[in-house]
């Protein structure tokens, strides 16, 4: 509806004509929520800005040819076009960048098929939204804002189910861009809170999105008018071989023992404009849990005049720039290690001082620091200290007499590159730390 309304707005049509575009129906417009910069015109309004591209034909790659400097401003509450901003004409990039199979003349022939078969079926059991697999138990959920939600994760230890996680889900994500020109500084969308990552779900296809013996979960959503919408095959669950779990060779007696690793994969994929986000929860036979976000799709593109080398981005095609940007994903995990009495410790590896007990200076050890309250957060990663965090239950001990716990091991990460005074640093303050800890109340 918005796209049709904008395409045929007289002021927008006039701006297209200035750029040599005489068919508005070939223009695609993605509405992006506008950041609040405290301007008078923004107060009390829900605004969006239209990002525009031009197709050569209806099935063309929509993101290859950006229409630079033309931005309709939308008042979502009034369902009106508030303003058409025109920063001046920049030539439309020449290349189509078509990737669809129908545009390709031939394909590679040097790859052989991989067949994944489980003649006896998968090892998991599903009843409704309850899943059992290799001593794991959990419930699978979904919301329009968060997307995939994992509930009540537990592990069967002998004859009892031991709780680990009460609830885990993406709580927010934001993608701030780093180009100050025209209105690109307003590109800082909260894809969860403002857009609703769960509403952007794909219906997954066997053999492409998911491979093997697949179990799908459907989800119940609603459309823009509040009508019920049942989406099929939104959540994919399957098993994967994951290489060697454990191995040891005893050369003295000539024996080798090897155990294969298998993991349970629960995933969903969302399309937000030009980008696809894949969200994957992995559960392993050794008790490990991983969370991974896979980013694919198409880079968000803007146009520059011929011969211009952009400072705040990379040329990806003639006259097409992909602006510098960062993707931040905030995952809320309500831990429940053997119950509710959990504490969080920061664990750093430290060098022991030279002393009578460390005369050669080779000793190092770990230092555990209790995170006592919210004021102790946020915490940041420190690869030079091999920093991790552990969630412990001091009232429950393992067979060695130590408090039971789970280690939180960070992966590759950075901090924001924006100036401290940038608006996004206030709007998305969670970016300033890698771990935030708060007691449930």
Residues of each region from the PLM?
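Short, structured motif recognition centered on aromatic/hydrophobic residues
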Residues: 2-10, 46-52, 72
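Short, non-transmembrane alpha-helical segments in secretory-pathway proteins
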Residues: 1-38
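A short hydrophobic beta-strand element
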Residues: 41-54, 264-268
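Extended effector regions of multi-domain proteins
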Residues: 1, 17, 55-148, 152-288, ...
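Short, charged low-complexity intrinsically disordered segments located at boundaries
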Residues: 34-48, 360-364
């Amino acid at each position: 509806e918005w796209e049709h309304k904008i395409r045929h707005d007289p002021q927008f049509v006039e701006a297209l004509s200035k750029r040599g575009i005489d068919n508005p129906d070939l223009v695609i417009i993605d509405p992006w929520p506008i950041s609040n910069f405290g301007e008078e015109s923004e107060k009390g309004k829900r605004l969006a800005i239209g990002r525009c591209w031009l197709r050569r034909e209806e099935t063309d790659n929509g993101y290859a040819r950006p229409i630079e400097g033309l931005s309709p401003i939308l008042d979502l509450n009034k369902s009106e076009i508030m303003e058409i901003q025109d920063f001046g004409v920049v030539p439309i990039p020449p290349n189509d960048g078509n990737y669809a199979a129908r545009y390709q003349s031939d394909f590679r022939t040097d790859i052989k098929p991989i067949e994944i078969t489980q003649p006896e079926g998968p090892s998991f059991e599903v009843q409704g939204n309850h899943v059992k697999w290799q001593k794991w138990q959990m419930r699978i959920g979904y919301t329009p804002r968060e997307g995939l939600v994992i509930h009540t994760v537990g592990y069967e230890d002998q004859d009892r189910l031991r709780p680990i996680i009460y609830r885990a889900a993406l709580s927010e994500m934001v993608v701030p861009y780093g180009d100050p020109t025209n209105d690109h500084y307003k590109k800082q969308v909260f894809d969860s809170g403002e857009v609703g990552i769960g509403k952007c779900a794909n219906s997954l296809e066997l053999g492409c999105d998911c491979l093997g013996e697949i179990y799908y979960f459907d989800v119940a959503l609603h459309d823009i008018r509040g009508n019920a919408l049942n989406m099929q095959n939104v959540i994919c669950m399957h098993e994967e071989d994951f290489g060697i779990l454990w191995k040891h060779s005893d050369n003295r007696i000539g024996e080798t023992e090897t155990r294969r690793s298998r993991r349970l994969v629960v995933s969903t994929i969302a399309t937000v404009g030009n980008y696809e986000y894949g969200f994957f929860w992995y559960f392993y036979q050794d008790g490990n849990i991983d969370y991974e976000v896979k980013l694919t799709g198409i880079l968000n593109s803007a146009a520059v005049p011929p011969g211009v080398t952009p400072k705040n981005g990379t040329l990806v095609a003639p006259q097409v720039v992909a602006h510098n940007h960062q993707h931040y994903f905030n995952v809320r995990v309500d831990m429940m290690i053997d119950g509710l009495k959990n504490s969080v410790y920061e664990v750093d590896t430290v060098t022991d001082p030279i002393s009578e007990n460390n005369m050669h200076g080779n000793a190092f050890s770990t230092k555990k620091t209790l995170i006592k309250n919210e004021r102790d957060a946020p915490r940041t990663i420190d690869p030079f200290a091999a920093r991790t965090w552990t969630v412990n239950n001091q009232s429950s001990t393992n067979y060695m007499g130590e408090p039971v716990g789970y280690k939180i091991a960070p992966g590759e990460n950075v901090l924001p590159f924006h100036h401290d005074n940038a608006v996004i640093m206030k709007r998305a303050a969670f970016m300033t730390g890698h771990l935030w800890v708060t007691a449930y109340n």
